[in-house]
C-alpha cells in the first residue's frame, strides 16, 4: 500500500501516544532480549518517521525504509538536520539495504501483506539483514481485533481544512478486513474540498503460523506478548507483539 493522499493527513489522525509506546517497547526489547549490543536500527514501513526520530533522540543510528515515496518525503522534511538515512524499498526484498543490529516493523504494517508467502519473504529478508544476535520486532492486529472489532467500525476526524472518514468491513477470508478511507481536503483557494478515497486491505494469520515461519527461517527466542510486550496474550488482546532473535 503506497498511502498516496493518506500520507498527507497521516500524522494528524494517528494517536501520538502510540509512537511513544512503540519506542519504549523497542528500547526495552533491545536491552533485555537482543543477543548483541543494539546501536544500528532499521525500521521497515517507517511511515513519516515518528518512531525513528524518537530512537534517534535516544542515540541510536537509524535507517528508515518505506515503499511509499509520499511517506518518505514527509519524513525527510520533518527530520531535517538529523543524520537519518531514508530508503524507498519493498520490505519483501530489501535490495541494497545495509545490515543492522535490530529491525522493527510496527503499526500493524505486516497486516498489509495478505498473502502469507509475502510475510515469509519479509521474515527471510529481515533475517538476511540482521547481524548475528540481532533482534526483530513487529506487531499485528489480533484475530479478535480483525474479526470482532473492525467489522462495522467507523472513525471520523474533522478539522477546518480536511475531514477524514474511516469505515471497516469484514471480508470473506478469515482474519481479513477492508478499510475504506474517504478524505475531503480543502483546496488552496479555500472555497472547495476535493474528495479522495483509498481502500486498504489487511490480513492477520494465527499466531502459530507466524511462529512456525520465523522458526523455519532461522529465528530463535521467539516470544509473543500483548500490551507492547508487557502482558501475556489474552483472547481480547487488540495487538500481538512478536520478538525474534537471529
Task: Map each language-model feature to its residues.
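Conserved class I S-adenosyl-L-methionine
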Residues: 1-45
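Class I SAM-dependent methyltransferase SAM/SAH-binding core
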Residues: 42, 49-93
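A short acidic, Gly/Pro-enriched loop at the edge of an enzyme's catalytic core
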Residues: 95-102
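Residues lining the SAM
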Residues: 106-108
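A short glycine-rich, Lys/Arg-flanked "PGG" loop and its adjoining helix->strand segment in the class I
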Residues: 120-132
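SAM-dependent methyltransferase
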Residues: 137-209
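C-terminal lobe and adjacent flexible extensions of AdoMet/dcAdoMet transferase-like proteins
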Residues: 201-246
Amino acid at each position: 500500500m503506497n498511502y498516496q493522499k493518506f500520507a498527507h493527513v497521516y500524522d494528524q489522525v494517528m494517536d501520538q501516544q502510540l509512537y511513544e509506546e512503540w519506542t519504549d517497547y523497542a528500547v526495552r526489547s533491545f536491552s533485555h532480549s537482543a543477543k548483541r549490543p543494539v546501536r544500528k536500527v532499521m525500521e521497515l514501513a517507517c511511515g513519516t518517521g515518528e518512531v525513528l526520530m524518537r530512537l534517534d533522540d535516544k542515540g541510536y543510528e537509524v535507517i528508515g525504509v518505506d515503499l511509499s515515496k509520499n511517506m518518505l518525503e514527509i519524513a525527510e522534511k520533518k527530520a531535517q538536520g538529523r543524520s537519518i538515512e531514508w530508503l524507498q524499498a519493498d520490505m519483501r526484498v530489501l535490495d541494497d539495504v545495509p545490515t543492522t543490529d535490530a529491525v522493527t516493523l510496527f503499526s500493524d504494517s505486516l497486516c498489509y501483506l495478505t498473502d502469507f508467502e509475502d510475510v515469509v519473504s519479509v521474515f527471510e529478508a529481515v533475517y538476511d539483514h540482521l547481524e548475528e544476535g540481532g533482534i526483530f520486532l513487529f506487531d499485528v492486529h489480533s484475530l479478535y481485533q480483525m474479526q470482532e472489532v473492525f467489522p462495522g467500525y467507523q472513525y471520523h476526524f474533522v478539522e477546518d481544512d480536511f475531514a477524514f472518514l474511516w469505515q471497516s468491513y469484514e471480508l470473506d477470508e478469515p482474519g481479513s478486513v477492508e478499510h475504506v478511507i474517504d478524505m475531503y481536503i480543502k483546496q488552496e483557494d479555500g472555497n472547495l474540498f476535493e474528495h479522495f478515497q483509498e481502500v486498504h486491505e489487511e490480513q492477520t494469520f494465527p499466531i502459530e503460523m507466524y511462529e512456525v515461519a520465523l522458526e523455519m527461517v532461522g529465528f530463535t527466542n521467539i516470544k509473543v506478548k500483548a500490551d507492547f510486550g508487557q502482558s501475556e496474550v489474552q483472547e481480547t488482546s487488540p495487538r500481538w507483539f512478536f520478538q525474534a532473535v537471529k
